[in-house]
């Protein structure tokens, strides 16, 4: 059986891993073992954070919507309740963009939500009295 020499493959493997770790500080970009450990951790962090990013953006959108709603005299939860009652289906990403970039359109949406909440509030009282 022929002898297998692995120097070329091993060097290529090490070279590609060190190239992956090229932006890291100190030994983590120069020494193979340290670089390998750091690259493995980096991949785990990126996997985790790709999932966390969805929640982070939703949280940011809610903060922006709440700030815009409070500027128009309504809280976030009342705004969302009013949008559901009014049958307005706009997602939080678009609402946040409107709150930041188009205050007039956002104010119009808030007014429709406020009217729907007020109508539901008076309708409920009238139904109980009857």
UniProtKB/Swiss-Prot annotation:
GO biological process: ribosomal large subunit assembly; translation
Gene3D superfamilies: 6.10.160.10, Ribosomal protein L20
Source species, domain of life: Bacteria
Pfam families recorded: Ribosomal_L20
UniProt-recorded name of the protein: Large ribosomal subunit protein bL20
One Gene Ontology cellular component annotation held by this UniProt entry: ribosome
Source species: Salinispora tropica (strain ATCC BAA-916 / DSM 44818 / JCM 13857 / NBRC 105044 / CNB-440)
Record gene name: rplT
Alphabetized UniProt keyword annotations: Ribonucleoprotein, Ribosomal protein, RNA-binding, rRNA-binding
NCBIfam families associated with the record: rplT_bact
GO MF, any single term: rRNA binding
Family: Belongs to the bacterial ribosomal protein bL20 family.
PROSITE patterns per UniProt: RIBOSOMAL_L20
Function of the molecule: Binds directly to 23S ribosomal RNA and is necessary for the in vitro assembly process of the 50S ribosomal subunit. It is not involved in the protein synthesizing functions of that subunit.
């Amino acid at each position: 059986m022929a002898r297998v020499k692995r120097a070329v493959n091993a060097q290529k493997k090490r070279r590609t891993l060190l190239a992956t770790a090229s932006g890291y500080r100190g030994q983590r970009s120069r020494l193979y073992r340290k670089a390998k450990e750091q690259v493995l951790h980096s991949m785990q962090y990126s996997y985790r954070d790709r999932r966390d990013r969805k929640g982070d953006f939703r949280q940011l959108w809610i903060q922006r919507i709440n700030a815009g709603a409070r500027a128009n005299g309504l809280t976030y939860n009342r705004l969302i309740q009013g949008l559901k009652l009014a049958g307005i289906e706009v997602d939080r990403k678009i609402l946040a963009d409107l709150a930041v970039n188009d205050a007039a359109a956002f104010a119009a949406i808030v007014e429709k939500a406020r009217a729907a909440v007020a109508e539901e509030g008076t309708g409920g009282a009238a139904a109980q009295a009857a």
